[in-house]
C-alpha cells in the first residue's frame, strides 16, 4: 500500500519502507488518533481551523522525535537543551530524527539578518578567516607576513641586477635626540644612517631636534641583486628585521619598498591581528564597529519628530517631548534663549530667524539645545539599559523622537576598519553581504583562489552556494544578505527560516512544516512546492500542516482532520492520496462542490485616501488611491512591496497624523484624505500575551464582565465579595498554593520540568471559598472552561458578553476555551482574537482597519466566515485594507491594488488596480492569471 502511495509525481516508485505509525494520539483535542504516514513522501495534514492539525504534527510527531533525540544524549548535555514534554500517545513507530519549522514571527532583533539566520554569513566568516587577504585599513595596501627568504626572493624576481640597499627603520615619526640609539648602532659596527631622508656618517654628529618627529633608517647592506648574492641578501634582511622590530626598507634603483614579517603595514605602522571568524562578527567585540557596536546605525534625535508641526506656537505644546512633562525650569530656559535671539515663544518654529532656530535646536554658549539635551538623556538611558526597569521605560518614552541614522564610522557595514580591510576577490565581507542572494553565488564562484587556498574554499563554499540556490529557488533572490530580519514580510521570513533549516541537503529526516505557503503568491508557492518535492526526493519525509489547495493536490498523502474544531475536532476524516479525498468538508471545497461566492456588487466607496510618491524600500515613487468605506486588498508577488506600502507608510502615516507615538512613516511625499479618518487599527499576528495567565477572556475584556457578573450573585454580595475576588492574578480569591496558575512546576534538572495539577485547587485556579459562589450552577472556573460556543448559550443574557462572544464565534473561534492560555494560540488565532476585540467595540464608523494576511491558519470554510465579518465592518462605514494572497479574499474585495510585477528591485510598481474583474484583465499581473480562474468558478486555487 505505502509503496503505491509514496510514489513520486514522475511515476518512479519508492522502495517498501515502514510507515510512521501513530497510535492513540490524545494530545489536546485529538481523540485517540491512529494514522500511518508513508516515509519519503510529501504528507499534508489539513482540516478546519482548530481541528487538531498542529497537535498531531508538532505536539505529537515532532515532539516525540525531538524527545527521543534529546534522551539519547548524556545527562550533562540534556541540561543545556530545550526539552518537550512526552506527548500523550500510545506509540509512534518508524520515526526518524525530526526538524520542525513553525509559522512564527522572526526575530525582531536588529542584529538578526538574512545572512545570520541562514548561517551563510557564518560560513563567510570562516572563509575570510581562512583565506582572506588583509590590507592596511589606512592606505589600503596589501598586508602580508613574509620571512626574510620570501622577501629576498621577491626582490631578486623584480630587481634584475639593479643595486639594492637594505635599511632598518629604527625610528618612524618619533620625537627625540636618539643619542643612546645612535651610540648603540655605532658600537654594533654600523656606519651609515639616513635621517629624515638625508644620509649621515655615524662617526659625525647627527643633527636631531628633540622637539620634532624624525625618521631614522640604518644602512645594513648595499649589494647587487644577483642570484649568487641570495644568501647574503637574506642575512642582511634578517639583521634589518631584527633591528627594526620586524620591518625592513629596501631601495631598488632608487625606488623604496617596505616589507614586514608580521601582519602589519610597514608604511603606516598599523598592525593587524591574526584573522579569526570572530574578527568578522558584528556580534563580537573583536569584530564589531566600536562606534555603533555592530548595529550599522546610531540613534539621533529627529527634529521633525520633536517639533512635528512647525506652524504651532512653541509655547503651545509644539515641542512634543515637553507637552506634558515640561517643567518651570525648562520654560524659563526657553524664554531666556528666546530673549537672547530676538524671538518669542508665541511664534512657531517656521517663523524663527535662522540663528534663533539654530540656538533653540542645537544650543548656544548658555543653552544646551533641545536636540543635544534629548540625545544626552537617550544615551544615558541606553547606558543604563541593563539597569532598573524605570530606566528602560524612560528610554521607551524618548524613542518616538529618535531616528536611526547610518553609522558615520563604518557606513552601515557594522565591522571594525581592520575587519573591513580584509578582502577576497577584491571585496570585503560587508561587500558580499550587501549583494543580493542572486548576485552572491556568481560573485563567490568568481573568486580566484590560489592553490594553497583551494582546500579551505572547497570545504566551505559548496554549502554556501547550496543555501543561496535554495533561497533563489523559493523566490527571495532579491533580498540582500545584510537585510535585517525585522524588515521582512511574513512570507519572506518563513522562506529564510526554511533555508536555514533545510538548505543543507540532509537525508533521512522528518521535516514538519507549519503552513509554508503563508505570505506566498501562487506563483511563488509553485516554486516552494518544487523545492519541497526535491527535499522529499533526497530521501526525507516532509509533513506539512496546510490549507492551500495547490499544496494539498501536490501531496503524496493527505490526512484530513475534523469534522469541526475544538471538541468537535480531533478525528481523522480521511487519510490517503488526494485524488480520493471526497466526503469531507475539505474534499467538497477541493472538488468545487462548495466555494466562496463572488459578491454580486462592489462598493464604490465614500471618499479616498491617496498616498503620493511612496518610495520606501523598493517602492518606485508610486501614487496609490485607496477608496474609503471599502474592503481593499493589496496583492502581488512576495516581496513586491505590499507590507512596505500598507504597514510602513499607510498605517504609520495615519497613526502619526492622529498624534500617536509610532515609528517614522516610510518615505513618501504626502497622504491626502486622512482628515476623514478618526482612528486606525493594525491587527497583526503577534501574541496576545506571553504568559499562561493571558487568555481570550482577559484580552477581549470578557473576564472583567464575568467577574462583575459573579460579584452580583446574592451569595457573593452576602459575603462582601467584589469583582476583584474573582481574579486569579491577585491575592484574595485565587489559590495561593499555585498562585492562580492551576499547575505547579516540578524541577527535574536533567529532564524537562514537569507540571502537575495543583493539589489544593485541582487545577481550578481559585480557592474553595471563591468556588462556592455559583452562577446558574457553575463556578467561575467552570465558566472559564467553556468554549466560546458553549458560553454563548450560558452567558447570552448578559448584553456585553453576548456581543463579545458572538464576535469570537463569528471569526471562527467558537472552539476556543475562554480560559485557554494565550501561549497555546497560533498567530492566526491571535490575530482573530484581536479582530474580535475590535468588533466588540462601538466604533465611530470612520476607522481604518489594517490586516496582514488575515487568512493565516484558516480553512476555506473559515475564510468564508471571516469575509462576512470584514463585510460587517465595512457596512458600518469603516475601511478595511488587507495584505493578502488568498484568491477567495481577493475576488471578494471591492478594490484591488496589485503590486509588482516582480519582487525586490523588479517590483515596487502598481501593476493593476480596480475591481477584481478589472485586475483579472491585466496581462502584466501575475495575480491576474490566477484570479481569472477563480472568477470563472474553477475549483479552489486558494485555501481548502
Residue ranges and their predicted role:
Residues 1-944:
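Conserved phosphate-binding elements of NTP-dependent enzyme cores
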Amino acid at each position: 500500500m505505502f509503496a503505491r502511495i509514496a510514489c513520486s509525481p514522475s511515476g518512479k516508485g519508492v522502495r517498501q519502507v515502514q510507515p510512521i505509525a501513530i497510535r492513540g494520539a490524545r494530545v489536546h483535542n485529538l481523540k485517540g488518533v491512529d494514522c500511518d504516514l508513508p516515509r519519503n513522501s510529501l504528507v499534508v495534514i489539513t482540516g478546519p481551523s482548530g481541528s487538531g492539525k498542529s497537535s498531531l504534527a508538532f505536539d505529537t510527531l515532532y515532539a516525540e522525535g525531538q524527545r527521543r533525540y534529546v534522551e539519547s544524549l548524556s545527562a550533562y548535555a540534556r541540561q543545556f537543551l530545550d526539552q518537550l514534554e512526552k506527548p500523550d500517545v500510545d506509540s509512534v513507530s518508524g520515526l526518524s530524527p525530526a526538524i520542525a519549522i513553525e509559522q512564527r514571527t522572526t526575530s525582531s532583533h536588529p542584529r538578526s539578518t538574512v545572512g545570520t539566520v541562514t548561517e551563510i554569513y557564518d560560513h563567510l566568516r570562516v572563509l575570510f578567516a581562512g583565506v582572506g587577504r588583509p590590507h592596511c585599513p589606512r592606505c589600503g595596501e596589501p598586508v602580508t607576513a613574509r620571512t626574510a627568504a620570501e622577501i629576498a626572493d621577491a626582490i631578486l624576481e623584480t630587481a634584475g641586477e639593479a643595486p639594492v640597499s637594505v635599511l632598518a627603520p629604527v625610528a618612524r615619526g618619533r620625537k627625540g635626540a636618539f643619542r643612546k640609539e645612535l651610540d648603540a648602532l655605532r658600537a654594533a659596527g654600523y656606519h651609515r644612517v639616513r635621517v629624515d631622508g638625508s644620509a649621515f656618517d655615524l662617526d659625525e654628529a647627527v643633527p636631531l631636534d628633540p622637539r620634532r618627529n624624525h625618521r631614522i633608517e640604518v644602512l645594513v647592506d648595499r649589494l647587487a641583486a644577483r642570484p649568487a648574492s641570495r644568501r647574503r641578501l637574506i642575512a642582511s634582511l634578517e639583521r634589518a628585521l631584527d633591528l627594526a622590530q620586524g620591518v625592513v626598507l629596501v631601495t631598488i634603483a632608487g625606488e623604496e619598498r617596505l616589507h614586514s614579517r608580521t601582519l602589519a603595514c610597514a608604511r603606516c605602522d598599523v598592525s593587524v591581528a591574526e584573522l579569526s571568524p570572530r574578527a568578522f562578527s558584528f556580534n563580537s567585540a573583536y569584530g564589531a564597529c566600536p562606534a555603533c557596536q555592530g548595529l550599522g546605525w546610531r540613534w539621533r534625535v529627529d527634529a521633525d519628530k520633536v517639533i512635528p508641526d512647525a506652524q504651532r506656537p512653541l509655547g503651545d505644546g509644539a515641542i512634543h517631548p515637553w507637552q506634558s512633562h515640561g517643567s518651570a525650569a525648562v520654560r524659563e530656559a526657553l524664554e531666556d534663549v528666546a530673549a537672547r535671539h530676538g524671538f518669542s515663544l508665541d511664534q512657531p518654529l517656521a517663523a524663527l530667524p535662522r540663528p534663533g532656530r539654530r540656538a533653540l535646536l542645537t544650543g548656544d554658549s548658555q543653552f544646551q539645545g533641545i536636540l543635544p539635551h534629548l540625545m544626552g538623556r537617550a544615551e544615558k538611558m541606553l547606558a543604563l539599559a541593563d539597569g532598573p526597569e524605570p530606566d528602560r521605560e524612560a528610554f521607551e518614552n524618548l524613542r518616538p523622537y529618535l531616528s536611526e541614522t547610518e553609522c558615520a564610522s563604518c557606513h552601515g557595514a557594522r565591522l571594525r576598519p581592520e575587519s573591513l580591510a580584509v578582502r577576497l576577490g577584491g571585496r570585503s565581507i560587508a561587500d558580499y553581504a550587501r549583494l543580493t542572494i542572486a548576485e552572491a553565488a556568481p560573485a563567490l564562484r568568481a573568486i580566484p583562489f590560489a592553490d594553497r587556498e583551494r582546500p579551505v574554499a572547497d570545504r566551505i563554499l559548496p554549502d554556501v552556494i547550496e543555501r543561496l540556490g535554495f533561497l533563489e529557488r523559493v523566490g527571495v533572490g532579491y533580498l540582500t544578505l545584510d537585510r535585517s530580519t525585522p524588515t521582512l514580510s511574513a512570507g519572506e521570513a518563513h522562506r529564510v527560516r526554511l533555508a536555514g533549516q533545510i538548505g543543507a541537503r540532509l537525508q533521512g529526516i522528518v521535516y514538519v512544516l507549519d503552513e509554508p505557503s503563508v505570505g506566498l503568491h501562487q506563483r511563488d508557492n509553485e516554486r516552494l512546492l518544487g523545492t519541497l518535492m526535491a527535499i522529499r526526493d533526497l530521501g526525507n519525509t516532509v509533513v506539512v500542516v496546510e490549507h492551500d489547495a495547490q499544496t494539498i493536490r501536490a501531496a503524496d498523502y493527505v490526512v484530513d482532520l475534523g469534522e469541526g474544531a475544538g471538541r468537535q475536532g480531533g478525528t481523522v476524516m480521511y487519510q490517503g492520496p488526494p485524488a480520493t479525498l471526497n466526503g469531507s468538508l475539505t474534499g467538497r471545497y477541493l472538488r468545487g462542490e462548495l466555494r466562496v461566492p463572488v459578491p454580486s456588487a462592489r462598493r464604490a466607496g465614500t471618499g479616498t485616501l491617496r498616498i503620493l510618491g511612496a518610495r520606501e524600500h523598493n517602492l518606485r515613487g508610486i501614487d496609490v488611491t485607496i477608496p474609503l468605506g471599502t474592503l481593499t486588498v493589496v496583492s502581488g508577488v512576495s516581496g513586491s512591496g505590499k507590507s512596505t506600502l500598507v504597514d510602513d507608510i499607510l498605517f504609520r502615516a495615519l497613526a502619526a497624523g492622529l498624534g500617536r507615538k509610532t515609528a517614522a512613516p516610510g518615505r513618501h511625499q504626502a497622504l491626502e484624505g486622512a482628515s476623514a479618518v478618526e482612528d486606525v487599527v493594525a491587527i497583526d499576528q503577534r501574541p496576545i500575551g506571553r504568559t499562561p495567565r493571558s487568555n481570550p477572556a482577559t484580552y477581549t475584556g470578557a473576564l472583567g464582565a464575568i467577574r462583575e457578573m459573579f460579584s452580583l450573585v446574592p451569595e457573593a454580595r452576602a459575603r462582601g465579595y467584589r469583582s476583584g475576588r474573582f481574579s486569579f492574578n491577585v491575592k484574595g480569591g485565587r489559590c495561593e498554593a499555585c498562585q492562580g496558575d492551576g499547575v505547579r512546576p516540578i524541577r527535574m534538572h536533567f529532564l524537562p520540568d514537569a507540571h502537575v495539577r495543583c493539589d489544593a485547587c485541582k487545577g481550578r485556579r481559585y480557592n474553595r471559598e471563591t468556588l462556592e459562589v455559583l452562577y446558574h450552577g457553575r463556578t467561575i472556573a467552570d465558566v472559564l472552561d467553556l468554549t466560546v460556543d458553549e458560553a454563548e448559550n450560558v452567558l447570552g443574557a448578559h448584553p456585553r458578553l453576548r456581543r463579545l462572544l458572538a464576535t469570537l464565534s463569528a471569526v471562527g473561534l467558537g472552539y476556543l476555551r475562554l480560559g485557554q492560555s494565550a501561549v497555546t494560540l497560533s498567530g492566526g488565532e491571535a490575530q482573530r482574537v484581536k479582530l474580535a476585540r475590535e468588533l466588540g467595540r462601538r466604533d465611530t464608523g470612520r476607522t481604518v482597519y489594517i490586516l496582514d494576511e488575515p487568512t493565516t491558519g484558516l480553512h476555506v470554510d473559515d475564510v468564508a466566515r471571516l469575509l462576512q465579518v470584514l463585510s460587517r465592518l465595512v457596512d458600518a462605514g469603516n475601511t478595511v485594507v488587507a495584505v493578502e494572497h488568498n484568491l477567495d479574499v481577493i475576488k471578494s474585495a471591492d478594490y484591488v491594488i496589485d503590486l509588482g510585477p516582480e519582487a525586490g528591485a523588479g517590483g515596487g510598481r502598481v501593476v493593476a488596480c480596480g475591481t477584481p474583474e478589472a485586475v483579472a484583465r491585466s496581462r502584466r499581473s501575475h495575480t491576474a492569471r490566477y484570479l481569472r480562474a477563480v472568477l470563472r468558478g474553477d475549483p479552489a486555487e486558494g485555501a481548502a
